[in-house]
Amino acid sequence: FKQKTAYEISACLVGSEMCIRDRYNSSETLNKLKDKGVTSFAMELMPRITRAQSMDILSSQSNLAGYKAVIDATYLFNKAMPMMMTAAGTIAPAKVMVFGAGVAGLQAIATAKRLGAIVSATDVRMAAKEQVESLGGKFVMVEDDETQDAETSGGYAKEMSEEFKLKQANLISETLASQDIAICTALIPGKKAPLLISKEQVNSMKPGSIIIDLAAESGGNCECSAAGETNNVNGVTVVGVKNITSTISQDASSLFSKNVLNFLDLLIDSETKELSIDWEDEIVKGILVTKNKEITNEEFI
C-alpha cells in the first residue's frame, strides 16, 4: 500500500502485518506504523535471489512499464516506427534511445525493436552492455575505471561521480540530437533519480520528438519532466509518467497479486494454514521494515 492515511493506520490492529510500497518516500507512514506496533514489509526490497523471483514486484511491474512506455511513445509519435519501402518512397525507421537497462529498460528495448525502430541504450553498469546488445540495441556508455564498480550487490546502479556524469552528458548530447524517441527508466534505490537529459539537450532534439520519463515520480531523468504532466518544449513532447502500470491494469494487477500470493505462501504454514513467519529467512529479513515498534531496516533508521 502506498502512503497510508492516518485513519487507515489507526484501523490496523497492534501486531498486524502489512505490505507497503514507495517506502523511501513514506517516512511519516513508517513512523506511524512503528508507533502503532504494525509489522510491515516493503516488497520493493525483495532480495535478488532465485527463490524470491516469483515475489519480485519491481520486476513484474517494471516489465510492463517498459513495454507501455514504448507503446505510448509510438502513439504520440507522428511518424511510423519501422522502415517502409514503397513505390511512393522510403520511410526511415524511428530512432529510439533508452536510458537505463534494468528490467523496464530492457523491455523497452525489446518492444521498440519489435516495432522496427533503431534502438540504442545507455547504462552505467558494464553488465548491461551484453544484455542490450543481445536484444539488438547499440550500447552507448562512457567506459572507464568507475564503471567497473557501478553496480550494487543487489544488481542496481550506484550513484556516479560528478566527473563521470559530465563525461556521460557529453556523450549523450552527441547521440540524443539524432533520436526521435527517448525512454527514461534510470532509478537509484533510496535516492532521487539521476538527471540524464538537460533542458539544453531537449532543445537539441528534433521537433516532433518524444520523451517518456518513467522516473518522473522520483525526480525525473529529464530536467523538463514533471510527474503526471505532458509538456511541449520547443516542439519536443515530454511526458512525466505517473503510475504507468495503472494504464495496463489488468495484467499489472494479475502479476502483482501473484507476487503477493507467493510471498504469503512463505509466511503461512502449509499444514496448519496459520501465520508462521521465519524471522531468520533471507527474504523476510530483507524486506522487513517495522516490527515490535521499531524500524528494523538500517536504510530507514
Task: Place the predicted regions along the sequence by residue.
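Adenosine-phosphate binding glycine-rich loop
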Residues: 44-87, 216, 222-301
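Generic hydrophobic/aromatic pocket-lining and core-packing "Φ" positions
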Residues: 30, 70, 108-109, 129, ...
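Glycine-rich phosphate/diphosphate-binding loop of Rossmann-like nucleotide-binding domains
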Residues: 82-175
